[in-house]
C-alpha cells in the first residue's frame, strides 16, 4: 500500500460513540496510516487542534461533524500563516451535512475517510461576513434561517433534514418576510424577502438547493432571493418551477452588501449572526480541500 502523510481528525464531541467510525480508523491504522484523533468539547477547541496539527506536521486536518464543525476547522485553517498549511478533509457526521453532500463526499465512513486522507487537494473559496465571521457553504436569511435556528435538537436528531420542513410547516402562520436592500457588482434589489441564500456552496437546511449554480472555486458568490407577500403561496410557487418564476431573484458577485431597517438574522453554516448591515465577500482560493475527482461544485 502507498504511504500517506499523517492526518489529524477533529471530531465533534457528539460523535464519540460512533462505533463504525472507530472501526474505520482502526482499520486504516492497521494498513499503515497515521491518524491522530482529537475531540471537541467547546467552542475554540477546533482552532487549538489546528495549531496542534501544524506542530505535528500533518498533511490534512479532517473535520468530523456537520457544517458547523467544518466551518470551525476551515476558519482556523485560513487564519494559519506560513508554508505547509494542512489541507481540509471532510468526514460528514452531522444532521444535514449540506456542504459534504453537495461536493460529493461519500456517505460511507470508510470511503469518506480514505478520501479525506488521500484525495486530491484543490484550492477552494470561502466567504467572510463583516471582515470577521466566515462560511464555507452558505449564508441564509429570512424564513429558512428562523426555521433552521429554531428547530428542536431532538427533532433534528430523530428526523434529520426532514425536521426543518416539518418545523417550518408548524410555524408557517407566524413567519413574515424581511424588508431589506441588497447591492453587489451590477446588482441592486430592495423589497420583502422570504428567503435569502448567498452561496459559496449550493444547498442548506437539509438538502434545499438554494443556490443551484454555485461553484466553490470561481471567485463568486451566488445570490437567490425568494420574494412574496405571503409565505405559503410564495413557497408553493417557488416549489413548482425555477424558470421565469417572479418570486425568485438571482445574482452573482464577489461581494454583497445587505441593509435592513430592522434586525435580521443570517445563518452561516449553522451559526446565527444578527444585525442590520452585512458585507459579505468571497475569499478566493482560501484553503485546499480534498475532494472527489467528479466534484460537481468545481468549474
Curated annotation (Swiss-Prot):
InterPro entries attached to this UniProt entry: ATP-NAD_kinase_N (IPR017438), Diacylglycerol/lipid_kinase (IPR005218), Diacylglycerol_kinase_cat_dom (IPR001206), Lip_kinase_YegS (IPR022433), Lipid_Phosphate_FormReg (IPR050187), NAD/diacylglycerol_kinase_sf (IPR016064), YegS/DAGK_C (IPR045540)
Domain DAGKc: 2-133
Binding site for Mg(2+): 215, 218, 220
PROSITE patterns: DAGK
Cofactor binding remark: Binds 1 Mg(2+) ion per subunit. Ca(2+) may be able to substitute.
Residues where ATP binds: 40, 66-72, 95
Subcellular localization, as worded in the UniProt entry: Cytoplasm
An example Gene Ontology CC term for this record: cytoplasm
Cofactor: Mg(2+); Ca(2+)
EC number: 2.7.1.-
GO molecular function, one term: lipid kinase activity
Positions of the catalytic residues: 271
Enzyme class of the recorded protein, top EC level: transferase
Keyword line: ATP-binding, Cytoplasm, Kinase, Lipid biosynthesis, Lipid metabolism, Magnesium, Metal-binding, Nucleotide-binding, Phospholipid biosynthesis, Phospholipid metabolism, Transferase
One BP term from GO: phospholipid biosynthetic process
Family: Belongs to the diacylglycerol/lipid kinase family. YegS lipid kinase subfamily.
Cited function: Probably phosphorylates lipids; the in vivo substrate is unknown.
Protein name (Swiss-Prot/TrEMBL): Probable lipid kinase YegS
Amino acid at each position: 500500500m502507498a504511504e500517506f502523510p499523517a492526518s489529524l481528525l477533529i471530531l465533534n464531541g457528539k460523535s464519540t460513540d460512533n462505533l463504525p467510525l472507530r472501526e474505520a480508523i482502526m482499520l486504516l491504522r492497521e494498513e499503515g496510516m497515521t491518524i491522530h484523533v482529537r475531540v471537541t468539547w467547546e467552542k475554540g477547541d477546533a482552532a487549538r487542534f489546528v495549531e496542534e496539527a501544524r506542530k505535528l506536521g500533518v498533511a490534512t486536518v479532517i473535520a468530523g461533524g456537520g457544517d458547523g464543525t467544518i466551518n470551525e476547522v476551515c476558519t482556523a485553517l485560513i487564519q494559519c500563516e506560513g508554508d505547509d498549511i494542512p489541507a481540509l478533509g471532510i468526514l460528514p457526521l452531522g444532521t444535514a451535512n449540506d456542504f459534504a453532500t453537495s461536493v460529493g463526499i461519500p456517505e460511507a465512513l470508510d470511503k469518506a475517510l480514505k478520501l479525506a486522507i488521500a484525495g486530491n487537494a484543490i484550492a477552494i473559496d470561502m466567504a467572510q461576513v463583516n471582515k470577521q465571521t466566515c462560511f464555507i457553504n452558505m449564508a441564509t436569511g429570512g424564513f429558512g434561517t428562523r426555521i433552521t435556528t429554531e428547530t428542536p435538537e431532538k427533532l433534528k436528531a430523530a428526523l434529520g433534514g426532514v425536521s426543518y420542513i416539518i418545523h417550518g410547516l408548524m410555524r408557517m402562520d407566524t413567519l413574515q418576510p424581511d424588508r431589506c436592500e441588497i447591492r453587489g457588482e451590477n446588482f441592486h434589489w430592495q423589497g420583502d424577502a422570504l428567503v435569502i441564500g448567498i452561496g459559496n456552496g449550493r444547498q442548506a437546511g437539509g438538502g434545499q438547493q438554494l443556490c443551484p449554480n454555485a461553484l466553490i472555486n470561481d471567485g463568486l458568490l451566488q445570490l437567490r432571493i425568494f420574494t412574496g407577500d405571503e409565505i405559503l403561496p410564495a413557497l408553493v410557487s417557488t416549489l413548482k418551477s425555477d424558470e421565469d418564476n417572479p418570486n425568485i431573484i438571482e445574482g452573482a458577485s464577489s461581494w454583497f452588501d445587505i441593509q435592513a431597517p430592522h434586525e435580521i438574522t443570517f445563518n452561516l453554516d449553522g451559526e446565527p449572526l444578527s444585525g442590520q448591515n452585512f458585507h459579505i465577500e468571497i475569499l478566493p482560493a482560501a484553503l485546499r480541500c480534498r475532494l472527489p475527482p467528479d466534484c460537481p461544485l468545481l468549474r
